[in-house]
């Protein structure tokens, strides 16, 4: 929308948005990450979003990656319309479009995987991570997972066990076992004293301790 950002309301959120935000908790869960953020999406075009009150915002989130080419992109809309007339859902059955996409992904994969990999399509990031955990455990025969403090991997059962942060974990335990968390080697707010060493070395030594000391259960 031209002119963004632009605010037509004298208050934020505007009156129409306030009504929707007030009603929302009565009918849907507000446990989403931005569930209480005082903004309502109504329309989107390009890199802009409009709320019910006509206020225009610049979207720098790209719809969490879903709208990387912009909202309401003409080619995307055309593809959605064309495919919806042909086939909207195929459950777990093979279908031509999914097969075409898997072939393209294999052809552009990094060296070593190019034309030598298969795809598994999931409905969400958390779902993809859950599948990756099952796949890794099945293929390797191992059950321990190492993740970094401060990392976000999802909010389903297994993915939530790997994710850290009170806003994601408080009240939902106990979590899946076999998960080990280690500090990321970044000097800003590094949790351990360095003793003259770099944070990369100290973090590496701690990971070595976690993985190679019997009583850490790793």
Model-derived features: positions:
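Glycine-rich loop-to-alpha-helix module at the N-terminal edge of alpha/beta enzyme cores
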Residues: 6-9, 14, 56-146
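PLP-dependent aspartate aminotransferase-fold enzymes
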Residues: 103-218
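A non-catalytic, amphipathic alpha-helix used as a structural packing/dimerization or gating element
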Residues: 19, 23, 79-82, 100, ...
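Active-site-adjacent loop/helix segments that line or gate small-molecule/cofactor pockets in enzymes
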Residues: 1-45, 203
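Beta-strand scaffold of nucleotide-dependent catalytic cores
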Residues: 24, 57-61, 209
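Short secondary-structure junctions and interdomain/linker hinges
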Residues: 27-34, 87, 112, 214-218
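Active-site and channel-lining beta-strand-loop segments
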Residues: 38-59
